[in-house]
Amino acid sequence: KCDILIGLSGCALLSAKKAKSRYHALFFCDRGCRHILSQDDILNSIPSARQVYRKDIKIELEQYGMADYIILPSLHTKESFIQEGEKVEKLFVNPYGVNLEMFHPLPLESDGYDIIFVGNWSLQKGVDILVDACLKSGLSLLHVGAIVDFAFPEQNDRFHHIDPVNQPELIHFYSKAKILCLPSRQDGFGLVLFQAMVCGLPLVYSHYTGGPDLKKLVDDHEFLFEMPEYTVDSLSDTLLKALKKAEQQPRNSIRNYLTPNAVSNISWQAYGQRYNEFLLKIATEK
């Protein structure tokens, strides 16, 4: 018997139909990013970016319609569903977490870069304006991840690229940078925000990431910097503010601005607890 089926969006259509017809189960559609139509609009505005597959749109929309609840990782993803006409009562936001055994506070290496960007080097993640902002302000950048749909400026010695590494190896690279930047045009959350924050790096991010959610989970917001506008100038100014804050961190010692309460709020255990409480509440009402 199945009381509740949790299925990833785009992957659970047939399972959801069977669970609802055979067991009268509730279907929770777990969507890791913005509404598919919003995501499609964003990518359509960047012709050279990887686009949404047309067949995926139909499947996603059918799942949204079937779902009793839609599980989302961030406030901006919730906003996108509301903008597409979804009922607020159907949406549950549960921010992701971080492996606290894998990531922990670190000192900054003496020859560190100004900025680290971790993840796919893609237009969807805003790397084009990140490059322009770095060039404008003369900042150095370390990238760890795959090159996707935007050329990496390898001819400039201020930029350094590392191919994708296994997640446990990332902590080594976080020690090489003063701040992390994630200027995505749309990113469901961006787990690298959690990772870098736990390692002690100030964060710069766009509204279209999980950055705004972090302000609800941690006590000290002084090291969290959201771009006021999605422009090169705004990003450049925000990067400089974050770097100024990074200069105030202790030299040659551990960087750590999170309280024990904040650390507990951003763990995977906390994510599971929030999810479990929601499931129990719904199961009781069913």
Which residues make up each language-model segment?
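Aromatic "clamp/platform" in nucleotide-sugar-dependent glycosyltransferases that forms part
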Residues: R185
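Short hydrophobic beta-strand element within catalytic cores of glycosyltransferases
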Residues: P202-H207
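Acceptor-binding helix/loop patch of EC 2.4 sugar-transfer enzymes
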Residues: A25-K58
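Carbohydrate-associated surface elements
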Residues: H76, G97
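Nucleotide-activated donor-binding/catalytic signature segment of Leloir-type glycosyltransferases, i.e.
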Residues: F150-I171
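Short alpha-helical donor nucleotide-sugar binding micro-motif in glycosyltransferases
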Residues: Y64, H172-A177
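Conserved donor-binding/catalytic core segment of Leloir-type glycosyltransferases
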Residues: P107-K125, V131-K136
